[in-house]
Each structure stands twice: as structure tokens, then as C-alpha cells.
Curated annotation (Swiss-Prot):
PROSITE patterns: DH_1, DH_2, PH_DOMAIN
Organism listed in the record: Gallus gallus (Chicken)
Record function comment: Acts as a guanine nucleotide exchange factor (GEF) for RhoA and RhoB GTPases.
SMART domains in alphabetical order: PH, RhoGEF
Protein's gene: Arhgef3
UniProt-recorded name of the protein: Rho guanine nucleotide exchange factor 3
Length: 524
């Protein structure tokens, strides 16, 4: 226990001692009190008695138990405004289905210490992880269809057209991975070891090109699913599934996003097998070829997914006047980043940074769909002026100061502006935190550098070396993905979906802008 916990612990301990004394002396007091005196209900006394920890519990354990029970007591005293949740103390906890995570050496009864070297054991573990991951993926895909798609269709919770949009080509992925699993199991020896996998992967990996349509549909699928969650029947069904053991406390989108997450893990899995494969092993060359194949497939799918995302948002832009239309928007194939920011009056704006133009919008609902109404004129990236406003710095006179109290410090602001002839505009935008602000600054700077380089070269290519990261965004192939796989999405009022940005400021400053084609990365 850390030092700061001691005062609270001692307070709880003294309270427990007081309860012990009160409980011990209560029988004697009852004989002396008048009969008309109000007595606490027995249920309340029992609840208080539950606060007393076991005598033999250690101090740390006693503190934990007391805290949990006191929380339970407070929640029980309130009216039941909401339906019980599986994490509530007053309802039996559901037995969440857990997945076995045994290692290869734990699964097969072999004397590995005498038969195989340490490096070979690690190689077998990596191959087994690949095979076990296929089993888990197949199980999850079948679960998504059986537990979500089919019941919602049968109960008419969603129409068949809506379900087809949300689930996409998920059905076609199941036999694809069943084929790889079958091949891996066929070459596994009776003792559980596998000698060669490289030739299998080289022959099977091209099948992953079928992921193209599934991944390209995910942006529209996620938007429709979020919209349908406003329907009470849909929300109730999904909540019941979430509380059921089979879901492992994962929502529907987690299951729908598993194929994409699996796709971007293949390069890592194959590199791990290659790392533990001897140089003179026949698999060495095949594994190197397989890695090149999967990297090319993922990069190509990522480009097409980015173009699909860009097109999706372009179709949902609403122009108040014809003068707001810009060919730079129509010709954009890449959406560098987008997200919610606030202006100096606290108004929420949704900002899109396309490859050559910055578009500031307001999110609105149009025909029961989330759309984005343009807020003033689009700003060409070539003419855009970016300014980093330091925390507490007032550069716009009273325009920012008036939006805050005298005691509140201005934080996480930056300004974008441009002037072209008689047209000029300036926007002071606030991110939700310093990290998010830095992401925006880096993304805009890199977009400007890319446009500048393209202007000198006379061409602007929309194809950069991106791969899908496990959190659904794009990262450059030069960036390691191990840390990306451990990151989780976070929601905030000023969130940002960064599709092609980098927070590596030092590298950005040290690199020649016109040689920086691989620099754009993603950090969510």
C-alpha cells in the first residue's frame, strides 16, 4: 500500500472498530431502552453488519472487502432506475466465457526439453499461435452470424438490407480461414510439431485479396450500426448480448472488426516464425516471400479502404451555397484526418483534412443520417497558414478571452487561416488535450509539405505506404505495429480520427519535406 492510502485506511479501520463496539454492546442496551423507541430495521442492521470484515483477514484484504461492501450498500439504498448490469454487486455475476490461451508446449505431451532446442521450441510456439488464432477467428465469425445476424433477421429487429450492409461479406471469410486451418493441421505431426509452413502460406495468402470489399465497407457499416443503435429494440438486443457470457463482454462491432484486426497481424506472426527459423531451414525463403506477399496485400487494401472512407465523407458534405463547392474536395482520394474540435466560442465543429483542402463543418442530422454542413469556405492546404497558440496566450484580443472565465486558462488552441485576394478567414480551434492538438499540428504540417513537394514535382499521388493498424487506422509500413496493437480507441468531445499523421516531431523536422513520402503515420 502506498503512503497516501494510509489515512483513509486508518479511518475505515476506526469505523470498523466502532461498529464492532456497537454490535457487541447492543444486546445490553436493548433491555434498558423504552419500548416505544424507534428501532432500525433489521435489514439495515444486517447490511451494516456486512460491513464488518472477517477477523482473520489481512489489513489490505480487509480494506478491500470493506470498500467493496460499502459501495454495494450505497448502491442498494438507491432506487432501481436502471436494469441490472452484470457488473452490479446486487446481481449474480455472469460466467463470462473465457478462451483457452495454452502454449504449444502445454498443449502437446512431448518431452521438448530433450528433443528440441530452445529456438525450435519458440518456432513451434509461433506456428501454434498462428494456428490457434485461426481457430479463434473462425469461432468468432461464426458467433457473429449465429448470435447476432440470424436472430436480428428472424426477429425483424433489422431489415435484411441493413444487416447485409453491416455484416458485409463476413460469411465469405469463414471458409477462407477454415482452409488455412485445415492445411496447418494436415502438416502437424503426431507429436504436435510442424516442420514446414512457408509453402502453405505462400499458396494461401493471395486469398486475402478478398478482404478488399469487406474492409472497404467498414466505414459505412460502422455508421449504419451506430445509427441503428438509436432504435430501442436494437439497443436492447445488443445490450442483452453484451451481458451474455458468450460475448466475452465484447460488443457487436468488436466481432465485426476482428477480421481486419487479424489481417494486420499476419505480418507480425510471420516475422515471429521467421525470427526463430534457422538460416539453413527450407522455410526461410518461403517465409520471406510470404511476408512480402502479405505486406503488399495489406498495403493495397489499406489504400482502397482509405479511398472508400474519403468517398463516404465527401458524399455526406452539405453545401449551403454553390460557392462552397471546390474541385479540391471532389478530386480528393485521401482523407488525411478528421475529428471534432471547438472554436473560440465553444461551438463544436467537425474538421476534415483532405489531401489538398481543409474543410470545417458542423455535424447535423439530415434524412435520419449524420451529415456535415460546411462552415464557411474550404481552405486550400497550399494557402493555409498554421499557427500554434501557446497555453494562456491571447492573440485574438477579446474573441478568445470572452469565451472563458477570468480564472480559466486557454489551452490546446491552434489557428488556421488563409488570405487569397479579397477572401480571407481565420479559425481558432481547440483540441481536447495537448496530445490531440499535436496530432492536428503534425498532420496539417505534413499535408502542407506533401502539397509543396507535389507542386515542385508537378504531381500529387494519393497512394502512400500505409497499412491497416489493429485500431482501424492507417500507419506507414516503416512503423512498428507492436505498440499500435496494444492501443485502444478513446472517445472524447474533441476526438480526432487520424488516418495519416505522425507525432514524431523530431523526425519530421530533420527530414527533407520533399523526401518525406513515408512519414505520414497514425496514432489514435
Amino acid at each position: 500500500m502506498v503512503a497516501k492510502d494510509y489515512p483513509f485506511y486508518l479511518t475505515v479501520k476506526r469505523a470498523n472498530c466502532a461498529l464492532d463496539v456497537e454490535a457487541a454492546s447492543s444486546p445490553a442496551k436493548e433491555t434498558e431502552e423504552p419500548s416505544n423507541k424507534r428501532v432500525k430495521p433489521l435489514s439495515r442492521v444486517t447490511s451494516l453488519a456486512n460491513l464488518i470484515p472477517p477477523v482473520r483477514a489481512t489489513p489490505l484484504k480487509r480494506f478491500s472487502q470493506t470498500l467493496q461492501r460499502s459501495i454495494s450498500f450505497r448502491s442498494d439504498s438507491r432506487p432501481d432506475l436502471f436494469s441490472p448490469r452484470p457488473w452490479s454487486r446486487n446481481t449474480p455475476a455472469a460466467n463470462t466465457k473465457r478462451r483457452d490461451s495454452k502454449l504449444w508446449s502445454e498443449t502437446f505431451d512431448v518431452c521438448v526439453n530433450h528433443m528440441l532446442t530452445s529456438k525450435e521450441i519458440k518456432r513451434q510456439e509461433a506456428i501454434f499461435e498462428l494456428s490457434k488464432g485461426e481457430e479463434d477467428l473462425i469461432e468468432d465469425l461464426k458467433l457473429a452470424k449465429k448470435a447476432y445476424h440470424d436472430p436480428m433477421l428472424k426477429l425483424s429487429i433489422m431489415t435484411e438490407q441493413e444487416l447485409n450492409q453491416i455484416f458485409g461479406t463476413l460469411d465469405s471469410l469463414i471458409p477462407l480461414h477454415e482452409d488455412l486451418l485445415r492445411r496447418l493441421q494436415e502438416v502437424r505431426k503426431s507429436d504436435g510439431s510442424t516442420e514446414h509452413v512457408g509453402h502453405i502460406l505462400v499458396g494461401w495468402l493471395p486469398c486475402l485479396n478478398s478482404y478488399d470489399s469487406y474492409c472497404s465497407n467498414q466505414v459505412a457499416a460502422k455508421a449504419l450500426l451506430d445509427h441503428k443503435k438509436q432504435d430501442h429494440r436494437v439497443q436492447d438486443f445488443l445490450q442483452r448480448c453484451l451481458e451474455s457470457p458468450f460475448s466475452r463482454k465484447l460488443d457487436l462491432w468488436n466481432f465485426l472488426d476482428i477480421p481486419r484486426s487479424r489481417l494486420v497481424k499476419y505480418p507480425l506472426l510471420l516475422r515471429e516464425i521467421l525470427r526463430h527459423t534457422p538460416n539453413d531451414h527450407p522455410d526461410q525463403q518461403h517465409l520471406e516471400e510470404a511476408i512480402n506477399i502479405i505486406q503488399g496485400i495489406v498495403a493495397e487494401i489499406n489504400i482502397k479502404t482509405g479511398e472508400s472512407e474519403c468517398q463516404y465523407y465527401k458524399e455526406r458534405l452539405i453545401y449551403l451555397e454553390g460557392g462552397q463547392r471546390d474541385s479540391l474536395i471532389d478530386n480528393s482520394r485521401v482523407l488525411c484526418c478528421h475529428g471534432e474540435l471547438k472554436n473560440n466560442r465553444g461551438v463544436k465543429l467537425h474538421v476534415f483534412l483532405f489531401q489538398e483542402v481543409l474543410v470545417i463543418t458542423r455535424a447535423i442530422t439530415h434524412n435520419e443520417q449524420l451529415c456535415y454542413q460546411l462552415y464557411r469556405q474550404p481552405i486550400p492546404v497550399m494557402d493555409l497558414v498554421l499557427e500554434d497558440l501557446q497555453d494562456g496566450e491571447v492573440r485574438l484580443g477579446g474573441s478568445i478571452r470572452g469565451a472563458f472565465s477570468n480564472n480559466e486558462r486557454i489551452k490546446n488552441f491552434f489557428r488556421v487561416s488563409f488570405k487569397n485576394g479579397s477572401q480571407s478567414q481565420s479559425h481558432s480551434l481547440q483540441a481536447n488535450d495537448s496530445f490531440n492538438k499535436q496530432q492536428w499540428l503534425n498532420c496539417i504540417r505534413q499535408a502542407k509539405e506533401k502539397v509543396t513537394c507535389a507542386g515542385k514535382a508537378g504531381v500529387l499521388s494519393s497512394e502512400a505506404c500505409f497499412i491497416l493498424s489493429p485500431n482501424g487506422s492507417r500507419v506507414s509500413q516503416g512503423e512498428t505495429m507492436i505498440e499500435q496493437m496494444d492501443q485502444s480507441d478513446s472517445e472524447s468531445d474533441c476526438s480526432m480520427d487520424t488516418s495519416e499523421i505522425s507525432i514524431d516531431c523530431e523526425r519530421m523536422e530533420q527530414t527533407n519535406p520533399c523526401e518525406n513520402e513515408k512519414q505520414i503515420e497514425t496514432n489514435v
